[in-house]
Amino acid sequence: MAKQVSPGVLALRKVVDDVHKEAREAKARGELVGWSSSKFPCELAAAFDLHVMYPENQAAGIAANRYGELMCQAAEDLGYDNDICGYARISLAYAAGVRVSRKYDPETGEYIIDPSTGKPLKDADGNVVMGEDGKPKKDPKTQTPYLQLDNLLEIEKLPDGPEKEKRLEAISPIRQMRIPQPDFVLCCNNICNCMTKWYENIARMCNIPLIMIDIPYNNTVDVHDENVKYVRAQFDKAIKQLEELTGKKF
């Protein structure tokens, strides 16, 4: 019997699927789509009706789908040290256009199946079907192709045609591999210091605006007025940047 998924989990999946779908559709319409750190004040983006995706969540999803090692290695091949966190490495590789892709035969277009994948094939009575070699047969419906890395930015430069179509199709269909490239980035570094350079690198790599909220370290119970003024001034600057980016008034 298949495992039952709770209504709450199904509802949350729909919320996430809808957010991803809306971002892809917005990008296709030519609207701005940004990437945001999880602690950036989301109300600012919402006030300007901006579509925002979250690289930290994306990186966790990529890792949960067992693509983390491939993406981390890709980031290291780009020159990033393996001492920085896996979230950052996965995101930086993705920002550079790296995508996990299903391997296929260029001549036939058929995907090349990894024999180590797939669930045991079962008969109508639910019994595992055994092969002549004495091992369980694999259900072909659950087998998956070998994985390789491709680069979306290189694919997009190709002329329209079968090769371009196939390479786009071969990119892993999980939603975390289909997040649009960013038009701007929103960063707040009150989680960790890595955030600052992570998002600066995305902005530099993609040649897009970075809107930054730098949170000063507070080592006392009380919050000093100077710190409040410092953060408030950055909110004012962020609003001005978003006005210039969108052409809208706050």
State what each model feature region is:
Residues 1-250:
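An N-terminal assembly and electron-transfer interface module characteristic of large anaerobic redox
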